Amino acid sequence: GSFCGRASNPASNQMDDCSSDGIDLTSIFSANGMPFYDGMQTELFINTNGNVSFGASNLGYQNASFPGEVTEPLMIAPYFYDADLTPEGDTEQTSRVYQWFDQNTHELMVTWENLGRYSRKHDKPNTFQLHLSQLTDSGECIAIEFRFLELFNVGAKGGIDTKNAATQIELPGSGGGDFSSKLLTDTNVNSPGVFVYVADDGGIQEYGN
């Protein structure tokens, strides 16, 4: 389902800094939720600024080092920047954020599609995805997959923020001028534009390590 858009709220003209309702992870993954950092997370929020957060929404964009300096809650951010879904004037909305999940295969996909940037600018739209999937029957091991489809440099940052410098992950080039091009051409799984990490009770590491 989608949220924060005219499709979900036809009367809304302001679609900046929105968040989904809390998603019950125990209904998608194991009965205990999803492993992340130092425990099992049971609730996830999807935020329009290119991230998901655990336990609480993260509505605003913070111009701080990420991962590391952004305040609570815990976050996974494919492409964290000051996004704005609000259409220009009366034009048709093309930006949207939506989710898909399967309780039988224990996976959740989030898509940020044609996202604009602050102050209703849509000249540099960004499209990317986050795919979370259960790797073991017990639910104690989860794949975190980033997929980048179309990006433009807007000063974005990305990674996995656990609030612990020893376990957090920073995507290649995060915060730099070539971040977008690196995400589209680099990979850690031999597929350009795709990065996969694994979360379990031992922390977070690159897939295959």
Where are these regions (language model features)?
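Extracytoplasmic Ser/Thr/Pro-rich, glycosylation-prone low-complexity segments
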Residues: G1-N209
